[in-house]
């Protein structure tokens, strides 16, 4: 999560609560840091000097802030995707309730997968890293299947819309085909412009999160130097790429291929 050379490496579950931040495995605390900077490792209180306590306080505050930012970014990205798909459905004939229902179901499946990773309850956030990194890769497979299902439904709808356009109205096949192509080109250009504007905004937010994660990584390394046992729970790695969504252009190329 979320940008080039900027990622949170979740193997366990991060819990952002009102009073503290916790890293859990099988619902058992690996570490816990409260708002004052007090650290517990596997349930045992760790005494630290004033400097380390302040560093821990800054760390939990940074994790809290960035987790909320990432969750907001993911939610807005999902909304953008849903909006784009809805516009495609409308362009292909919004009077088709069966198509709308099937696409809504596919988008709903994607949202359900995301909701199993990020759980919000009141003001608390739980990021289930254990579900992302499960041994059999089941989550990744199911997520990819849901994406493929959405694209298959839209591709099928496009073919049906094309066939309907060819069978209606006057004129020969070539004329109808050209008119349909012009209609789809205009729609595609308009949609691309709208999604690019929104996508650029999301990317800018991702850049900001990435910058702040790099700063937080420095704090994390300071903690690991001061409390060596924390090295086992490294959350931030600025040397690796995070999970990235496909760019709009790539999706269009796949659709045109």
Predicted regions and their residues:
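N-terminal Sec/ER secretory leader and immediately downstream segment
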Residues: 1-110
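Short, surface-exposed, charge-dense and proline/glycine-enriched linear segments
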Residues: 82, 97-121, 155-158, 224-231, ...
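Short, flexible coil/linker elements and helix-boundary hinge sites characteristic
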Residues: 93-94, 168, 217, 234
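Charged/polar interaction segments and conserved charged motifs
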Residues: 1-32, 166, 170-173, 177, ...
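A cross-kingdom marker for long, charged
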Residues: 177-257
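Extended amphipathic alpha-helical interaction segments
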Residues: 104-207
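Residue-level signal for secondary-structure boundary elements
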Residues: 68-71, 78, 82, 115-118, ...
């Amino acid at each position: 999560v979320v940008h080039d050379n900027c990622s949170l490496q979740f193997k366990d579950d991060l819990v952002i609560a009102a009073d503290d931040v916790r890293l859990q495995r099988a619902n058992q605390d690996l570490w816990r840091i409260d708002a004052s900077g007090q650290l517990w490792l596997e349930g045992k209180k760790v005494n630290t000097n004033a400097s380390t306590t302040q560093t821990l306080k800054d760390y939990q505050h940074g994790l809290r802030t960035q987790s909320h930012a990432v969750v907001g970014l993911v939610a807005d990205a999902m909304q953008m995707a849903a909006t784009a798909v809805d516009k495609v459905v409308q362009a292909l004939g919004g009077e088709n309730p069966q198509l709308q229902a099937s696409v809504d179901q596919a988008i709903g499946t994607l949202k359900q997968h995301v909701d199993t990773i990020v759980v919000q309850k009141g003001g608390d956030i739980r990021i289930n890293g254990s579900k992302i990194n499960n041994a059999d890769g089941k989550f990744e497979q199911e997520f990819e299947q849901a994406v493929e299902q959405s694209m298959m439904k839209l591709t099928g709808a496009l073919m049906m819309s094309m066939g309907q356009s060819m069978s209606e109205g006057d004129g020969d096949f070539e004329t109808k085909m050209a008119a349909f192509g012009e209609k789809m080109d205009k729609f595609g250009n308009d949609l691309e412009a709208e999604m690019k504007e929104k996508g650029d905004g999301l990317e800018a937010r991702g850049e900001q999160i990435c910058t702040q994660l790099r700063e937080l990584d420095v704090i994390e390394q300071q903690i690991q130097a001061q409390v060596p046992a924390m090295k086992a729970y490294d959350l931030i790695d600025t040397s690796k790429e995070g999970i990235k969504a496909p760019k709009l252009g790539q999706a269009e190329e796949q659709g045109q291929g």
